Amino acid sequence: MGKDSHYSSKKDRVFVRGMQGQYSLREELARLRAMPRVIKGREMKFVDGPQSFSKHFVEPVDGLTQTLHVHLEEYAPGGRTQKHGHVNEAAFYILDGRGYEVHDGVRYDWQAGDVAIVHNNCVHQHFNASPHKPARALVIKTKPMYMFMNMLFQKQVEPRPTEPAAGPEAAAFGARETETDFNH
């Protein structure tokens, strides 16, 4: 980007394009009120793997909410995610385990009880620091709002690992599908 690019300049910009369409608030409220209010996590399955797994509770495609995307991430012992970036922000509430993030080349350590914030347009990757225990995070994103405004952009920089992480715990690890006690 050059010296005069919008990225680094103080030029006036339009951040939100004009939006229009057929929209009845009464019909939309009726549709939303007819949607389920409780998502049964036990009935959902993890996807992805073998080093990081996701269970998507609320996704843009569901039409359940207008502004939120909520999912559970589980990282295998020593596991890592793909390296990627996106315009929407994300908050990771660490449920259990310990690990770290790398955001734009800077490492940030976390443990259970912490909240990791991924800012807009940040290239990031998530890592489980323990070679023996899994880690979990509840993730809340503003992705549907960006989709609605036609401003969503996401890019993968490094793909998701296709092989388990090193070590016997990681090689044998599968997402905890059958867990019944969620009080960690």
Residues covered by each model-derived region:
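Short beta-strand His + acidic residue motifs that chelate non-heme Fe in jelly-roll/DSBH
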Residues: 81-84, 101-102, 118, 124-131, ...
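Glycine- and acidic-residue-biased ligand/ion/polar-headgroup-sensing regions
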Residues: 77, 88-99, 104
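Conserved short histidine dyad/triad with adjacent acidic residue
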Residues: 54-58, 70-85
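A generic "binding-loop/recognition-motif" signal
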Residues: 87, 106, 122-123, 143
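A short, N-terminal "cap"/entry segment at the start of jelly-roll beta-barrel domains
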Residues: 1-66, 153-184
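Short acidic-glycine-tyrosine-enriched beta hairpin
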Residues: 105-121
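A short hydrophobic beta-strand segment most commonly corresponding to one strand
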Residues: 67-70, 91-93, 117-118, 132-151
